[in-house]
Amino acid sequence: MKKLTEKQQKVLDFIKNYIQQNGYSPSIRDIAKHFKLTPRGAHIHVIALEKKGYITRNPKNSRSISLVKRQESILIPVKGKISAGMGIEMFEIVDEEIEIPVRMISGFGNYFALKVEGNSMIDAHIINGDYVILKKQYRIPNGQIAAVVFDNKVTLKRFYHKKDKVELVPENKDMNPIVCDAKDIKVIGKLVGIIRFYE
């Protein structure tokens, strides 16, 4: 959904509260009276809320405003495990999905999750057993955390491209960076979030 202006948010909040208190929606005149607007001014805000996907309405019925239930979470596939260490073999087939908050992703894209094995990224607050949420992409800015394939193994590291070399830097002071030829690695995803379950 598109972002609301401050005034549109106030109108939406009024509509929500009105429905909760009365069991039916306000009319355009109710909205206009509350905000000291002309009916036309109130109508403009209602149309904006409808266009942005926050409400639906029937123009033939003065009290037909309905709130659109926002999707709070989505399911994305878990494609296997990823090493936060020396690297593990390429994706295993995993018939699993994980639920993540919609706010964790932005815009269009292909998202997937991998389960972390190892502790090379602990200083970035990524620990063994976490699920990392990745946006599928093949190019990534320097300094970002990425899932990369190297020597047929997939690993999670901070990524730096330097001329014809790539440096994969762990977030663990006890571990050393991996330096390799750029042609020998493949970026498969950019880190966008972490999910952790507590037992």
Curated annotation (Swiss-Prot):
Keyword DNA repair attached: yes
Any GO BP: DNA repair
Keyword line: Autocatalytic cleavage, DNA damage, DNA repair, DNA replication, DNA-binding, Hydrolase, Repressor, SOS response, Transcription, Transcription regulation
Superkingdom of origin organism: Bacteria
InterPro entries (alphabetical): LexA, LexA-like, LexA/Signal_pep-like_sf, LexA_DNA-bd_dom, LexA_repressor, Peptidase_S24_LexA, Peptidase_S24_S26A/B/C, WH-like_DNA-bd_sf
Chain positions of site Cleavage: 84-85
KW Transcription (keyword) present: yes
One term of GO molecular function: serine-type endopeptidase activity
Reaction equation(s) it catalyzes: Hydrolysis of Ala-|-Gly bond in repressor LexA
Quaternary data: Homodimer.
UniProt function note: Represses a number of genes involved in the response to DNA damage (SOS response), including recA and lexA. In the presence of single-stranded DNA, RecA interacts with LexA causing an autocatalytic cleavage which disrupts the DNA-binding part of LexA, leading to derepression of the SOS regulon and eventually DNA repair.
The protein, known as: LexA repressor
Organism: Thermosipho melanesiensis (strain DSM 12029 / CIP 104789 / BI429)
